[in-house]
């Protein structure tokens, strides 16, 4: 599946210059392409869409939107390990929900998300220009314009979730001194809903290699499902019936199903997953950016996986989250047994032969130089021990992997859709038998006993266990009213800290932006 997409993508990058800055609103997109030689077939439109999707490759790397989502939740953190990982305090701030408008992770997330919006705007503008000139058949262009508008709606879903109150920029042909004003979270919600309602019906329902890792009808429905599930947070009123309707279209299509093996979704070659509704098709050569081994593994873990580069020893999970998995849950794995795939690397760590324990002679850990990833973390800062914290092992680290993985990253996965529907049904009626059955599908695959009833804590915990490190946990905590509470290495915080600050550099450059409360 990935080969088809790379062929079209690379063709687009070869034909079209996409090297301009994301912040340059006046760039020329097709200055070397004649309209009478291009946009005559679906393949040519697909090639032109390449830039809209290449922005996504920044999703999973260190310092990205994904990183900020995860580290500001209860399932991941980056402790300061002596002289390592202080980084101006930005990761300590993120985990404590004490965000600073000047922190790089806040600024980089904003630039990443609006860079994606701007690329969609560029392409929409160019397509519409060619249509107005009579150079492109409007009927041929409509589904591709809808694809871009839906992708832009996804960028705005992430923006409204993370930053809350943001500008709505839906045009590319603006003045050089254009300074968009802040819109309320409810206004951004309404914009996303309108874009999806107008665009999703025009998207293809075909699910095969030609639509893999592209926005199709069911991706649009997944975006709607997430938007409506979080409507109470975003606009102050629930929309659970709409969330259920969106999930039903995906479920009843028959195009998706649970993989029998949970970890099939996270293998190096996972592009054939029956669960993937929309994924980022990473590749160690052609589509780099998935840097997880560098981000989470201990320096000596290079010997476990025969990695080409030494990892950075940063990201880890927390004891409370790790212990939320019961023993026997296939997602938890077995401490000290690296031969068994798991969401975590925990316990004794070994060389690639599986027999010789890794040794860290400079270790500051009380249990000596033998490398042991302990769930308990001795300190958030300044001297977290080098081996403290179980590491993120959910995605397969291939033997001799480079810093860039070839695993595709799921943005929307069928298991998530089942849990979205279950939650929406439960919120309408806490005793709903269908909600319980949906959650138990997930638990059965994980090898744990079915629930006999559902509580809010059950739902939140099961979402956490299933969707670990897929960039939804912070949003889930907010929706369940748990984000503000005190937890390990985080004090109790005000509700206004549920969203991130607008970066100081953006406010300095645009007087029409308003800072979020609390900052």
Residue spans for each PLM region:
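C-terminal substrate/ligand-recognition segments
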Residues: 103, 107, 344-440
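Short coil/turn linking the two alpha-helices of tandem helical-hairpin repeats
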Residues: 158-161, 165-167, 230-237, 427-430
